[in-house]
Amino acid sequence: GTKSRPMDRKSEIFQEYSELVMKHYKEWHHVAEYASAMHITVPHLCSTIKQASSRTAGDLIIEAIITDAKAQLKLSIAPIKEIGLSLGFDNVAFFNRFFKTHTGITPKNYRNGED
């Protein structure tokens, strides 16, 4: 059979980063927090993620937050403020702006099916 070669360091970093993002995106919104947990520099983390995935380290955090926000907006009746809080946004205006920046639509409009 074919022997699988050990993952190279780039893939390892990407894997570890992805797992950390899925675990911590609600409280860690900044790449620096992940780099610090992984004991590597921000530039090293960013360039490695870019090479391994053709997306940026920041994009992966944003995608995790937006995916969760969209699911909550569609599946729960919790107030938007609470959804924002659950995702680490203390300020509902900031959550609204973040959501709209990355989706082109407000959380309220998204919830009302205007996508």
Language-model regions: role of each:
Residues 51-93, 112-115:
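Terminal helix-turn-helix DNA-binding modules in bacterial transcription factors
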Residues 45, 94-95, 99:
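Short hydrophobic/aromatic patch on the recognition helix
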Residues 1-3, 17-30, 49, 53, ...:
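Basic, amphipathic alpha-helical hairpins
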Residues 38, 87-88, 99:
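Core residues of bacterial helix-turn-helix
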Residues 1-40, 44, 112-115:
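Inter-domain helical "communication" segments and dimerization helices
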Residues 28-62, 67:
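Charge-rich, low-complexity intrinsically disordered segments
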Residues 97-115:
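…primarily DNA-binding HTH/wHTH and HhH modules…
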